[in-house]
């Protein structure tokens, strides 16, 4: 009888131990407990964006400081020329060497944590210049032929109103549809290239990743 009671007690103890340490009942964070982590991440991202907005005036100054780097990138200096519409501007090797030295000198003077966003602002200025170069040609090809057809037979006082109502929305859609995706892709490609080429050329460290402004900064 005693033996039976002992076995019964041991079985009960084993059952209780199994229930207490059931792996399926281990602690798991609830969604309510995960919310503070997500909120902290969102706050950190907002702080980075606010810091970037505060740095924009400084980045515009650094953009001017890196003007030699911009000139070096757009000119036909070694294999660094990456802007198609400026490849005809070929410089002498001596001029390229001077420009390279000036670029490296200015890049070294910029604080390390600001080099990446400063290079990005230079790339944005180059792409904005490229957009300004091509957009008048696009406007001329799109606007003038259709304007000539529509304005025939329309009185001069009404012509300006009609052409503005017809062509300006279409022209805006065409230019936005062509330039905005293309410009964003060019910015990303040229930014990646510049973040590799300039540090290697100047033998300076530039962080490979940095928060960057999405809105175009002032050009040169």
UniProtKB/Swiss-Prot annotation:
<keyword id="KW-0926">Vacuole</keyword>
<keyword id="KW-0873">Pyrrolidone carboxylic acid</keyword>
<feature type="region of interest" description="2 X 8 AA tandem repeats of Q-Q-M-L-L-Q-Q-Q">
    <location>
        <begin position="41"/>
        <end position="56"/>
    </location>
</feature>
<feature type="disulfide bond">
    <location>
        <begin position="69"/>
        <end position="202"/>
    </location>
</feature>
<feature type="repeat" description="1-1">
    <location>
        <begin position="41"/>
        <end position="48"/>
    </location>
</feature>
<feature type="disulfide bond">
    <location>
        <begin position="103"/>
        <end position="104"/>
    </location>
</feature>
<feature type="repeat" description="2-2; approximate">
    <location>
        <begin position="138"/>
        <end position="146"/>
    </location>
</feature>
<keyword id="KW-0732">Signal</keyword>
<feature type="repeat" description="1-2">
    <location>
        <begin position="49"/>
        <end position="56"/>
    </location>
</feature>
<comment type="function">
    <text>Seed storage protein. Serves as a source of nitrogen, carbon, and sulfur for the young developing seedling.</text>
</comment>
<keyword id="KW-0677">Repeat</keyword>
<comment type="subunit">
    <text>Monomer.</text>
</comment>
<keyword id="KW-1015">Disulfide bond</keyword>
<feature type="modified residue" description="Pyrrolidone carboxylic acid">
    <location>
        <position position="20"/>
    </location>
</feature>
<dbReference type="Pfam" id="PF13016">
    <property type="entry name" value="Gliadin"/>
</dbReference>
<feature type="region of interest" description="2 X 10 AA tandem repeats of M-Q-Q-Q-Q-F-F-Q-P-Q">
    <location>
        <begin position="128"/>
        <end position="146"/>
    </location>
</feature>
<keyword id="KW-0708">Seed storage protein</keyword>
<dbReference type="InterPro" id="IPR036312">
    <property type="entry name" value="Bifun_inhib/LTP/seed_sf"/>
</dbReference>
<feature type="repeat" description="2-1">
    <location>
        <begin position="128"/>
        <end position="137"/>
    </location>
</feature>
<keyword id="KW-0758">Storage protein</keyword>
<dbReference type="GO" id="GO:0045735">
    <property type="term" value="F:nutrient reservoir activity"/>
</dbReference>
<feature type="disulfide bond">
    <location>
        <begin position="116"/>
        <end position="210"/>
    </location>
</feature>
<protein>
    <recommendedName>
        <fullName>Avenin-3</fullName>
    </recommendedName>
</protein>
<feature type="signal peptide">
    <location>
        <begin position="1"/>
        <end position="19"/>
    </location>
</feature>
<dbReference type="GO" id="GO:0005773">
    <property type="term" value="C:vacuole"/>
</dbReference>
<feature type="disulfide bond">
    <location>
        <begin position="77"/>
        <end position="96"/>
    </location>
</feature>
<dbReference type="InterPro" id="IPR001954">
    <property type="entry name" value="Glia_glutenin"/>
</dbReference>
<dbReference type="InterPro" id="IPR016140">
    <property type="entry name" value="Bifunc_inhib/LTP/seed_store"/>
</dbReference>
<comment type="similarity">
    <text>Belongs to the gliadin/glutenin family.</text>
</comment>
């Amino acid at each position: 009888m005693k033996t039976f009671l002992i076995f019964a007690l041991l079985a009960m103890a084993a059952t209780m131990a199994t229930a207490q340490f059931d792996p399926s009942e281990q602690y798991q964070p609830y969604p309510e407990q995960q919310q503070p982590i997500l909120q902290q991440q969102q706050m950190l991202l907002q702080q980075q964006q606010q810091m970037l907005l505060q740095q924009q005036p400084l980045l515009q100054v650094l953009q001017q400081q890196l003007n030699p780097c911009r000139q070096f990138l757009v000119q036909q200096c070694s294999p660094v020329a990456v802007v198609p519409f400026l490849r005809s501007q070929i410089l002498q090797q001596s001029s390229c060497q001077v420009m390279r030295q000036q670029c490296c000198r200015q890049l070294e003077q910029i604080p390390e944590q600001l080099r990446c966003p400063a290079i990005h602002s230079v790339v944005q200025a180059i792409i904005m210049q490229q957009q300004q170069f091509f957009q008048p040609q696009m406007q001329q090809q799109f606007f003038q032929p259709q304007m000539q057809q529509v304005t025939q037979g329309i009185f001069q006082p009404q012509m300006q109103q009609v052409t503005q109502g017809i062509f300006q929305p279409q022209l805006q859609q065409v230019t936005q549809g062509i330039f905005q995706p293309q410009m964003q892709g060019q910015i990303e490609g040229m930014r990646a290239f510049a973040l590799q080429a300039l540090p290697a050329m100047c033998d300076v460290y530039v962080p490979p990743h940095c928060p960057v402004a999405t809105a175009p900064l002032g050009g040169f």
